[in-house]
């Protein structure tokens, strides 16, 4: 009679290097969009703050732009969440993909300026624990 060991992983989805690699064009596009939206939101918030400081009505175009940018950002972030892909540093474009390497749950680690997925790290070691993929 055999003994079966059932491993409970933290994440439901685990990416192979190839699966993560295939998503990079879309991930790059989303990272660029998120950074643009973050900058736009900052500008809109500064404008709205100035308007409220002056006692002006904050309705109108600026509020509409802010709401649209926020909704677009939330939509993109929902795509990351749905796929269980994690943005670790938006400004750097640092992204982690859950994976299994040698029966261990780890993250494949990628930055937006890297041409391909080449590194991994333990779940709790972060970027400083990056190692080349085997």
Name the predicted role of every residue range.
Residues 1-49:
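Long, hydrophobic N-terminal alpha-helical segment
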Residues 13-16, 23, 30, 55, ...:
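Amphipathic alpha-helical coiled-coil segments and their boundaries
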Residues 13-14, 74, 102:
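A generic "functional-site adjacency" signal
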Residues 43, 47-50, 54-57, 82, ...:
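Heptad-repeat coiled-coil alpha-helices
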Residues 61-85:
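Charged, well-structured alpha/beta interaction segments
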Residues 39-44, 57-60, 70-72:
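Short acidic/polar alpha-helix capping motifs at helix-coil junctions
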Residues 6, 59, 71, 92-94:
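Residue-level detector of functional hotspots within protein domains
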Residues 78, 82-134:
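Glycine-rich, aromatic-bearing surface loops/beta-hairpins
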């Amino acid at each position: 009679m055999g003994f079966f060991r059932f491993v409970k992983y933290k994440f439901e989805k685990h990416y192979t290097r190839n699966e993560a690699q295939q998503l990079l064009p879309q991930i790059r596009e989303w990272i660029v969009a998120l950074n643009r939206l973050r900058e736009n939101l900052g500008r809109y918030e500064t404008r709205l703050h100035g308007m409220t400081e002056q006692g002006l009505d904050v309705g109108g175009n600026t509020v509409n732009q802010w709401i649209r940018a926020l909704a677009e950002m939330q939509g993109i972030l929902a795509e990351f969440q749905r796929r269980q892909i994690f943005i670790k540093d938006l400004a750097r474009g640092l992204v982690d993909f859950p994976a299994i390497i040698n029966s261990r749950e780890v993250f494949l680690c990628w930055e937006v300026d890297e041409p391909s997925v080449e590194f991994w790290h333990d779940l709790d070691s972060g970027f400083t624990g990056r190692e080349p993929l085997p």
